[in-house]
From Swiss-Prot:
Gene coding for it: bioB
Organism phylogeny: Bacteria, Pseudomonadati, Campylobacterota, Epsilonproteobacteria, Campylobacterales
Organism: Helicobacter pylori (strain HPAG1)
Domain called Radical SAM core: residue spans: 1-228
Pathways involved: Cofactor biosynthesis; biotin biosynthesis; biotin from 7,8-diaminononanoate: step 2/2
Annotated InterPro entries: Aldolase_TIM (IPR013785), BATS_dom (IPR010722), Biotin_synth/BioAB (IPR002684), Biotin_synthase (IPR024177), Elp3/MiaA/NifB-like_rSAM (IPR006638), rSAM (IPR007197)
CDD domains named in the record: Radical_SAM
Protein's name according to its UniProt entry: Biotin synthase
Function: Catalyzes the conversion of dethiobiotin (DTB) to biotin by the insertion of a sulfur atom into dethiobiotin via a radical-based mechanism.
Amino acid sequence: MQEIFLCSISNVRSGDCKEDCAYCTQSSHHQGAIKRYKFKDEKVVLQEARALRELGALGFCLVTSGRELDDEKCEYIAKLAKAINQEELGLHLIACCGRADLEQLEFLRDAGIHSYNHNLETSQNFFPKICSTHTWEERFITCENALRAGLGLCSGGIFGLNESWEDRIEMLRALASLSPHTTPINFFIKNPVLPIDAETLSADEALECVLLAKEFLPNARLMVAGGREVVFKDNDKKEAKLFEYGINAVVLGDYLTTKGKAPKKDIEKLLSYGLTMATSCH
């Protein structure tokens, strides 16, 4: 039976980001109807970590909005990492905090963070069409810094931004050059507050994207993330094909500002596909 890994997300700092990423409701440029807060209380984060671990999650990603890491964010994430690790839950801790230099990433590593997530999002050529406040090159450098710091690298992208197939290939080729441990695969879902006018990918096109990712990243853990619950809604047969085509990890529960599938029902569905849940990160 195929084994899959469950990962979960905690949005520990939400909204009011000054970047203008066209796909993100946390950008202050778009005024999305989302919850905004500076730092989530440590007790709440610990409760989330315990609950998600009990459901079977092995990965736990601490996400902060904003362009980059700063001293305040570093201290906050380090404090959370130490508190979670003291619980001895066996969670693989991931930080996702934007642009970061080598020294910052080494600090997080020493505090107990295991991996760093920083997505390329799309191709170098297409990126200026979805963001003008920072460059694709900055993202790539942060990924390199994570590797230099000795952290696991989690890096992927978004399909369905009106990019071409050539853009998809270029993004995957760039990701392959980084050899990420895990690659999140997101599918863009149209939102009236966002400037991107793109129709939701069909399940068939989404599956083609997964096949392409598997071709370029045969050794990465391919994790289906945002958009799965919309693209494959009420289509169990095609959702099951995700795992035949190369997906071996799933985001369990909610995303940053959107609802995911109910965790218990999602796990039941995954089990019905003949999958087993991994019990350790290896």
